[in-house]
Amino acid sequence: MTLPEIKRALAKSLALPTLRIWPLVLLTLLHIGCHNPTDTTETTEAQHTQSSDTVLRCGLLIDGFADEPLLDQTITLRDGRILTVEAFRQNLQSDQSPPMTDLSGFTCLPGLINTHVHFDGNPEDSVDYSIYARRTADETLQLVLDNASTTLRTGFTTVRHVGAWFPDAVYQARSLIEQSKALGPRIQTAGPYLTIPGGGGDLTFPEIPPDQIPTESQQGIASTPSEFAERAEAAILAGADFLKVIASGAVFSIGTDPGAPEMTRADIEAVVAVAKAYGKKVTAHVHSDQSGRDAILAGVDSLEHASLLEDSTIDLALKRGVAFSMDVYNGTYTDTIG
């Protein structure tokens, strides 16, 4: 799918009636470049626009640099990247000007980033986990693609896919999107969950007979540091952009305790060592304080959830430069679903 086709699809899906309060249009492009509005060299270049350029006219623009939204701005795009951002000037428009998409009744802003997604499932799947055994490979791939498309259409141009029971489907979807054969955001994926048998990342639920558990979901299961190192390397060679360890129990897994550690510090260190050898980062699913501390000391780059961490562990993370991706909205969903 070409950039103009993507733009038209987005414009159609986001076409909202003009309101007194500007409706929100998210400028969602598969390749967004950074722009410094004070850079005059780009302004000069814009005077020599090419026929392949695309221009968007935005009623309001939130560019991430100015303290206030900018009024009536034009964004010039070339080869999928932002070339210039400047005030709209009617007198400069001519028959030779590149085509302009009029979004003067909308607000534009750069694409958003979601740091914690799982495209290979839906929220309602937690009501009956047997759906994971009943979906075919094609159905799972389509689910990933559908969720990716929905995510892009709501304004998120980059996502961090933090583990999957069906990592191969995510790899396939990422490839299709990169080849412009499907509509979706950039996907950085951790591949399979690296987890202990029966742990928070193991697809073991009463609804699924053991002999029907999809083998794809078992790619990251290990019991010792050496096994975790093997699984980590296999995930990277299969296409993982980074790695995800399930250091503690998980809220929606059966038979696990979110407040209890599952992987040992040695297990996590083994994964981190492999990741560093390949120039990859590691994130850790942690709820328990002990798991958070173990993961930090083992050398992970970030923590997911971090629900039960003590202040001292948070201070340790700050000292070690460990980032947090806490997805705090999950609390409301958990209270509702149980």
Please state what every model-predicted region is.
Residues 197-198, 246-338:
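Active-site core of metal-dependent hydrolases
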